[in-house]
């Protein structure tokens, strides 16, 4: 099939789509794909029809930037770690900047924030070695807040959606690929005098391609950064710079890290002991 034939085939698809019902459209798509496979134009048909594979990732690479208005750095030791400086009971507002463009992803963000579900690494009788993991940050932070800290640990969140960028933490879904191959990125703006987080910006890359499970893992990890957590040393922890999607839950180590951070203690390095 020459270029003119391919162009004509594409025009036929577009013309017929407007005239057919959804059922007939699906039948037509399958028929045309069958023809395309025969003549070797299958990839072209897939692109023209906008069929996109939703990718699952075993591990997710992430990056974390700290900006103190003078220096932006990914070196966790270059600038002091910071936390939110809140009045007790304050609410952090999380703005899904382009949530209207990705309505199917909003429930995933809500799950990562509000879920009360807890999972365990043991099945059956609870033993001394049982480890508990949290799906929702609000629930995990309420557990962390049971310990007294110098600063109030955030426990209340409100999700909003505005293209103007309001809110304390913003989340943006991007169809683009990150230049360094990262799927998630968090940049926090800090007041270095008080080690206070002023604003956090989360970007999820390849948002049109990644699966819901991968997206959930990314949001959970990046929100950890937005709360102030650095990358963890343990390869098995949610906060590792390249974390496992299937085990991307909030661990007791992450909760202890929050307690340490909001007690204005050092968290360099962020080590998870006995991680399983």
Residue ranges with predicted function:
Residues 241-271:
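Post-HExxH zinc-binding segment in Zn-dependent metallohydrolases
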Residues 93-96, 170-173, 200-205, 226, ...:
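Structural recognition of the beta-strand scaffold that forms the well-ordered cores
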Residues 106-220:
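Metzincin-family zinc-dependent endopeptidase catalytic domain
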Residues 94-106, 203-214, 240-248:
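Second-shell loop/turn segments in exported
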Residues 4-17, 21-105, 111-123, 179-180, ...:
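Disordered inhibitory propeptide/activation segment of secreted metzincin zinc metalloprotease zymogens
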Residues 50-52, 90, 167, 198-200, ...:
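Residues that flank catalytic or metal-binding motifs in active/ligand-binding sites
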Residues 217-231:
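Active-site recognition of the HExxH zinc-binding catalytic motif
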């Amino acid at each position: 099939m020459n270029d003119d034939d391919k162009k004509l085939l594409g025009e036929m698809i577009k013309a017929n789509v407007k005239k057919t019902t959804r059922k007939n459209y699906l039948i037509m798509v399958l028929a045309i794909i069958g023809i395309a496979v025969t003549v070797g134009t299958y990839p072209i048909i897939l692109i023209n029809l906008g069929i996109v594979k939703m990718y699952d990732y075993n591990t997710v690479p992430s990056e974390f930037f700290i900006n103190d208005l003078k220096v932006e750095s990914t070196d966790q030791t270059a600038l002091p770690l910071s936390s939110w400086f809140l009045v007790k009971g304050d609410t952090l507002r999380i703005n899904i900047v382009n949530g209207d463009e990705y309505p199917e992803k909003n429930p995933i963000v809500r799950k990562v924030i509000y879920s009360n579900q807890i999972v365990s690494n043991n099945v059956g009788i609870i033993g001394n070695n049982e480890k508990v993991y949290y799906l929702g940050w609000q629930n995990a932070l309420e557990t962390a807040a049971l310990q007294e800290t110098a600063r109030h640990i955030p426990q209340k969140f409100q999700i909003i959606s505005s293209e103007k960028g309001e809110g304390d933490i913003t989340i943006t879904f991007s169809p683009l690929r990150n230049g360094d191959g990262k799927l998630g990125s968090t940049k926090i703006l800090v007041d270095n005098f008080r080690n206070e987080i002023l604003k956090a910006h989360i970007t999820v890359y390849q948002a049109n391609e990644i699966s819901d499970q991968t997206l959930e893992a990314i949001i959970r990890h990046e929100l950890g950064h937005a709360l102030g957590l650095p990358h963890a040393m343990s390869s098995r922890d949610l906060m590792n710079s390249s974390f496992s999607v299937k085990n991307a839950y909030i661990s007791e180590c992450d909760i202890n890290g929050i307690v340490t951070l909001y007690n204005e203690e050092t968290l360099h390095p962020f080590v998870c002991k006995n991680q399983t």
